[in-house]
């Protein structure tokens, strides 16, 4: 039977010579992950009746879907009431909510919510910082994302370890892989943004990737789904700086830091084009950054291409 993350991380398996896998002994982090997992079926069940836009405007100047607001409020209520959480911030809120004292949590409640209409994959991203917001990448103590795909799963990263969980309809869950690693041989790629707005050096890099017959395009319009392809099969995902958006589209605190942390904990690499995503400076919770993550050899090639090196392979 499935049980809580805390029990999966700490209990001994009676019929096994080895102890069960443990991400952390920190009870607060375990509780955060537990809430994310147990809330996932409620978010998923709430999607069908919330597939239209609201009349509101979020900090990005966009009209969120009703599902975005629903997921945000649900997670705010659950996480904000947890002892040991000092701040709750989300992409849908202009500023962080003061919830007491302790860790800071940044949430992208429904990454890829534009996929609701086409019924494609989407997810929830969480970053946990041991510092006030806006935090630094070095302040991360845990990160996770829930993927609402054919099944509901959660990738969780803590202390250099990454585990994959399947989440059942009743909110229970169990690990399906306890030491997730980015495959060393890349096979998939996916890049966001309109092609006419790609910088020339990035466009050239993409052309080189596309000419490799061993590589397959996997892009679905929700970063968590595309990143999960890379985490599963090896490869590269990127949302570049654009000619009309030099800082890119994705947000440092909600997407860049946590996804970079997860991929690096799994043995992959992350970059903003010249350095690790975890080294990016952020002075506002809604700061943006270009995002590139994946197999280290490809991320290194990308950085070389963006630096104008003639031979980045």
Swiss-Prot record:
Cofactor-binding details, from the entry: Binds 2 magnesium ions per subunit.
Ranges of compositional bias, category Polar residues: 1-13
UniProt-annotated binding residues for Mg(2+) 1: 91, 108, 110
Subunit note: Homotetramer.
Cofactor entry: Mg(2+)
Family (UniProt): Belongs to the FBPase class 1 family.
Pfam family of the protein (one): FBPase_C
InterPro entries: FBPase_C_dom, FBPase_class-1, FBPase_N, SBPase
Keywords, comma-separated and alphabetical: Carbohydrate metabolism, Cytoplasm, Hydrolase, Magnesium, Metal-binding
GO biological process, one term: fructose 6-phosphate metabolic process
Protein name, UniProt field: Fructose-1,6-bisphosphatase class 1
Organism (species): Haloquadratum walsbyi (strain DSM 16790 / HBSQ001)
HAMAP family in the record: FBPase_class1
Ranges annotated as biased composition (Acidic residues): 14-23
Residues that bind Mg(2+) 2: 108, 111, 255
Gene: fbp
GO molecular function, one term: magnesium ion binding
Subcellular locations according to the entry: Cytoplasm
A GO term from the CC aspect: cytoplasm
Binding site for substrate: 111-114, 219, 249
Signal peptide from the UniProt entry: none
Catalysed transformations (reactions): beta-D-fructose 1,6-bisphosphate + H2O = beta-D-fructose 6-phosphate + phosphate
EC number of the protein: 3.1.3.11
Biochemical pathway: Carbohydrate biosynthesis; gluconeogenesis
Ranges for region Disordered: 1-23
């Amino acid at each position: 039977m499935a049980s809580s993350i805390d029990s999966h991380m700490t209990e001994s398996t009676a019929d096994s010579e080895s102890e069960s896998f443990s991400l952390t002994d920190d009870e607060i982090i375990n509780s955060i992950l537990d809430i994310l997992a147990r809330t996932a079926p409620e978010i998923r069940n709430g999607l069908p009746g919330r597939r239209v836009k609201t009349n509101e405007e979020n900090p990005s100047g966009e009209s969120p879907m009703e599902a975005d607001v629903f997921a945000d409020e649900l997670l705010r209520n659950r996480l904000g009431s947890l002892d040991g959480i000092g701040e709750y911030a989300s992409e849908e809120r202009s500023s962080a909510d003061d919830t007491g004292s302790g860790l800071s949590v940044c949430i992208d409640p429904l990454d890829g919510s534009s996929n609701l209409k086409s019924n494609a994959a989407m997810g929830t991203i969480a970053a946990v910082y041991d510092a006030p917001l806006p935090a630094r990448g070095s302040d991360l103590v845990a990160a996770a994302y829930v993927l609402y795909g054919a099944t509901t799963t959660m990738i969780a990263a803590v202390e250099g370890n990454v585990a994959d969980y399947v989440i059942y309809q009743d909110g229970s869950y169990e690990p399906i892989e306890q030491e997730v690693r980015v495959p060393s041989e890349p096979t998939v790629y996916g890049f966001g943004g309109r092609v006419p707005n790609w910088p020339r050096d990035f466009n050239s890099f993409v052309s080189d990737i596309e000419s490799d017959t061993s590589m397959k395009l996997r892009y679905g319009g929700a970063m968590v789904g595309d990143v999960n392809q890379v985490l599963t099969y090896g490869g590269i995902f990127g949302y570049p700086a654009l000619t009309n958006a030099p800082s890119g589209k994705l947000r440092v605190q909600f997407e860049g830091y946590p996804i970079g942390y997860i991929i690096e904990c799994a043995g992959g690499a992350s970059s903003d084009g010249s350095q690790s995503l975890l080294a990016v400076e952020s002075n506002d919770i809604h700061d943006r950054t270009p995002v590139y993550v994946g197999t280290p050899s490809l991320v290194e090639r990308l950085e070389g291409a963006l630096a104008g090196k003639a031979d980045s392979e």
